Amino acid sequence: MTLNEYQNLAMTTLNPALDKKDVLINGVMGLCGEAGEAIDIVKKHLAQGHDLDREALIKELGDVAWYLAETAYALDISLDEVCARNIEKLRRRFPEGFSEENSIHRAE
């Protein structure tokens, strides 16, 4: 499945009563909430002696993907385009791959 296919399928479950502004707000709030749930799983593993709950973490990553798709939809941009723009930025920042020097003195 491509990112655009995922976005199109995921958006069939979008609340149709929301306008674009509300979709955007819901998307970014959802991203924060789901990222927090993912962090909590890792925190329990690293700091509280729990086994890493890989399946729960994968489910949370799926929720992050849904809210990312929703946020991109609200901005009228495809996930493929979001990711392509990110790769362009990373190539400018780290043209030869990651280096601490480029990280410290990174190009924006």
Regions found by a protein language model. Give the residues of each.
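Flexible "arm" and connector segments at domain edges
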Residues: 1-61, 65-108
